[in-house]
Amino acid sequence: MIFRFNKKKYKGIWFFGLSGSGKTYFSEKIKSKIKNHVLVDGDNVRKLISSDLNYSKAHRKIQISRVLGIARLIIESNKFPIISTVYMDKNINYLCKKNKIMCLMILRKDFGKMKKNFIIYKKKNVVGKDIFYENFKKIELINDNSPLIFKC
């Protein structure tokens, strides 16, 4: 799979999708193509900054708002944020566009089979099980386990 990304048009990139969809994989792939990048993993932000939040939909909205704030600080420092989170909503997606951050939803082709084996899907407040994405226009990238080539 070849993914073309215009570095001159965007100041950052944000991958979002269900647990196990490949967000970290895509982040790792694109970082080698972009100088002055800073990786922002939603799990790390939750552990280091948002430990006061739980996994409810309301707290997920607060979490991604904080992640956007971090991304904006990175952009102001003339660096390129590469972000990955599970959740995204219509408002933050809109603010990302205003800040020239491209948002991509990662979908896994074989996810139905995989989901049954993930322990996380036995818990509550799980995106894709109890919490669903709001209805907004999303750019989708299908992870079908084929080799990925980023063209920047």
Label each residue range with its predicted role.
Residues 1-8, 29, 33, 98, ...:
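NTP-dependent small-molecule kinase module
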Residues 21:
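ATP-binding Walker
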Residues 114-152:
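Small-molecule kinase domains that catalyze NTP-dependent phosphoryl transfer to phosphate-bearing small molecules
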Residues 24:
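Walker A/P-loop
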Residues 13-15:
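Hydrophobic anchor at the beta1->P-loop junction of P-loop NTPases
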Residues 58-103, 107, 111:
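Glycine-rich phosphate-binding loop used to anchor ATP phosphates in small-molecule kinases
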Residues 27-76:
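Conserved substrate/cofactor phosphate-moiety recognition/catalytic segment
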